[in-house]
Regions:
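Short, surface-exposed loop/turn segments at secondary-structure boundaries that line and modulate
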Residues: 98-143, 177-189, 265, 283-304, ...
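Beta-strand segments within the central parallel beta-sheet cores of soluble alpha/beta enzyme folds
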Residues: 100, 279-286, 313-323, 350-355, ...
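Alpha-helical support elements that line or immediately flank enzyme active sites
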Residues: 70-104, 147-167, 243-312, 369-379, ...
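Glycine-rich loop/linker segments at domain edges
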Residues: 45-48, 114-128, 198-243, 334-420, ...
Length: 592
């Protein structure tokens, strides 16, 4: 059961623009809307999607477009001694073959783009250069080495098979914990010990805080300890990643049609990598077949096909295959936690200590270093009243696919760590797990509650949430169910996990309403729908607030040319921040 939606809308300074007062204002507005408020609305997207009329990347072929296929590394780590494309160019239908040398000559920047993450003693996040096509070394299996563009996909695949790459294999390390051991192969010379950043930013004075926590642990009656593995995973969305790149020679501009979580953020990042102005590239996204964090930022393939479109003068289309996606899509998780909880003789929580290491992969991915640092640690101490927390995290390079956000992005790891160590505390103290939790819940009278991490909970009633969860789960009836299962040779377990996470962390959001004439209204948002009913939810809010017909509203999204302020559909924040911005625009329209 989750208390997230009810109690944690304003848990950090990241989401201060959408706090409880804002949401109360929205709720007050809703009470004054039309009579249709609260009535069931059929999703306007459903008819189109169920009839197969949704437009995805593959549904918008461009005239005279070429097919792209990538040559990928079969090695975990290797030096590229040479790349011979002569045979590939002789394949019927092959138009061009690009290598890392071509991308170097194009002068593009690194795909590793990340906001600053401070380390210990003034250290900073190490971000090695990540090319669109590898030119001197490959750092993980599946890394892009060459791009073949041809008249057909079959010809492009034949051309890729004809590319000869001479590799010299090098020592590699793929295990997270092995990467930080003495003597492990070093991926990057400026990242000793394979440490991208040694983060202790959960406290403004980490050294003093660490000493205080150590003192409490040394005198604690009980210390519960658990070591936890957070397994690496791959997203496998229904629609794989894909894009079509076009180049307009007359205007020296690009158009990238791509399945993304936000056209504007994709446009801005891609322009920065290609070292062109934002006005020189347009990014559009229509329907998206699943994203979950996977499709937020640019990938090597997008930069490569954009350059190929310019070089060939023709649109270039690429769609990932399933096996290809497993080797090239951003992965997630792959981290390890040592967690300790200090308790007094009565079972009161005194201090929490976490030592966390998380794999970045071979490069730094889109906000990948935020996952095991800010995202994870700001969810502590969950619903528990813990006065002292020492949370430290090391981001580590390994010869694996880059990791990036996926469904929760660090927040589930925080809840897992908390609840596992609380259960261990119940075991070693002999206190009932539920009673131990009740004893240590943050009181409903303690709000606003500032955590040792520095975030503030604006409200909450965790005891009530716990009671409701136990009732819904029929906790008291578990023993009987377990006994019945045992008779049938089955195992049955039960547990408690309260997920309390900060959300709504995108930096800025906006909305625009235009009135072209008559009763029609055009609502333009930067937000990208990936299955969240945006075309239904946002127009309905506007219709109810303005007292107009829902059918008269046209909803626009997924086009960087609209120039609406905003980020992308990330961080569980779209409904809250977009509804907030929509209400503000509505208020402006009403009062002006």
């Amino acid at each position: 059961f989750s208390s997230r939606r009810r109690h944690t809308r304003c848990l950090s300074d990241w989401s201060s623009d959408v706090c409880s007062s804002d949401l109360k204002a929205l709720a007050d507005m809703d009470t004054k809307t039309s009579a249709s408020h609260g009535k069931r609305t059929i999703r306007v997207e459903d008819d189109m999607l169920l009839r197969g009329k949704g437009r995805y990347v593959s549904d918008a072929p461009q005239p005279n477009q070429l097919q792209a296929y990538f040559v990928r590394s079969p090695h975990v780590c290797a030096k590229i001694k040479s790349v011979d494309i002569s045979a590939a160019l002789k394949i019927k239908g092959v138009v061009a073959v690009l290598t890392g040398k071509d991308m170097q000559e194009a002068g593009h920047g690194s795909l590793s783009q990340h906001p600053p993450v401070p380390g210990r003693n003034g250290g900073k996040l190490i971000m090695p250069f990540r090319p669109a096509l590898a030119h001197d070394r490959v750092m993980h299996i599946g890394e892009t080495v060459a791009l073949v563009v041809a008249e057909t996909l079959a010809a492009a695949q034949d051309g890729a098979e004809a590319v000869e790459v001479d590799y010299e294999q090098q020592d590699a390390v793929v295990d997270l914990r092995a990467a930080v051991e003495k003597g492990a192969p070093q991926l990057w010379p400026d990242a000793p010990g394979n440490i991208a950043v040694d983060w202790a930013g959960a406290h403004p004075k980490p050294e003093e805080n660490e000493k205080e926590v150590d003192r409490v642990f040394a005198s604690a009656k009980h210390v519960a300890k658990v070591s936890l593995v957070h397994n690496r995973l791959n997203v496998a969305s229904m629609e794989p990643r894909g894009a079509t790149a076009s180049y307009d020679k007359a205007n020296d501009s690009f158009h990238l049609r791509v399945c993304s979580q936000g056209a504007r953020v994709m446009r801005d990042a891609t322009a920065q990598i290609m070292k062109i102005g934002n006005d020189k590239i347009r990014v559009t996204t229509e329907e998206v077949g699943g994203a979950f964090g996977l499709k937020t930022g640019p990938y090597p393939e997008y930069i490569a096909i954009l350059y190929a479109a310019k070089k060939t003068g023709r649109p270039v289309y690429w769609m990932s295959g399933r096996s290809e996606a497993f080797l090239s899509d951003n992965h997630a998780r792959d981290s390890y936690s040592d967690v300790e909880l200090a308790l007094d003789e009565k079972g009161k929580f005194l201090a929490l200590r976490i030592r966390h290491i998380c794999a970045m992969g071979a490069y730094i991915g889109a906000v990948g270093a935020n996952i095991g640092t800010y995202n994870m640690m700001r969810c502590l101490p969950g619903m528990y009243d813990i006065k002292l927390i020492d949370a430290q995290s090391k981001c580590v390079f390994t010869n694996t696919v880059v990791t990036a956000p996926y469904r929760g992005a660090g927040r589930p790891e925080a809840s897992y760590c908390l609840e596992r160590v609380v259960d261990e505390a119940a075991r070693i103290t002999g206190i009932d797990p539920i009673r131990l939790r009740r004893k240590n819940l943050i009181s409903s009278k303690a709000f606003p509650y500032k955590t040792p991490i520095g975030t503030t909970y604006d409200s909450g009633d965790f005891a009530t949430v716990l009671d409701k969860g136990l009732a819904l789960a029929d906790w008291d009836g578990f023993k009987a169910r377990k006994k019945e299962s045992k008779k049938r040779g089955l195992l049955r377990g039960i547990g408690v996990c309260a997920v309390l996470e900060h959300a709504g962390g995108a930096p800025i959001e906006g909305a625009q309403m235009t009135f072209p004439g008559g009763e029609s209204l055009v609502l333009t948002l930067n937000v990208q729908s990936t299955g969240q009913s945006h075309a239904t939810v946002f127009p309905r809010v506007v219709a109810e607030r303005l007292g107009i017909k829902f059918e008269t509203i046209t909803h626009r999204h997924g086009d960087s040319a609209h120039e609406i302020a905003g980020y992308a559909s990330v961080g569980s924040d779209r409904k809250s921040t977009r509804l907030n911005s929509s209400h503000l625009v509505i208020s402006y329209a009403v009062f002006c």
